[in-house]
UniProtKB/Swiss-Prot annotation:
Identification of the protein by name: Protein PsbN
Family: Belongs to the PsbN family.
Subcellular location: Plastid, Chloroplast thylakoid membrane
Keyword terms of this UniProt record: Chloroplast, Membrane, Plastid, Thylakoid, Transmembrane, Transmembrane helix
Chief localisation class: plastid
Gene coding for it: psbN
Gene Ontology BP terms: photosynthesis
Pfam family, one: PsbN
Keyword Lipid metabolism appears in the UniProt entry: no
Taxonomy, superkingdom: Eukaryota
Amino acid sequence: MESPAFFFTLFLWFFLLSITIYSIYIGFGPPSKRLRDPFEEHED
């Protein structure tokens, strides 16, 4: 368990997981109220 590859893999896993959780929070959480919708702005 002292292998550098193990710690690097663990770091990458936590990094990707945190980016995924942050993206979901931005997309669906309270900050999503400030996001603009280009389809609603477009008039036909």
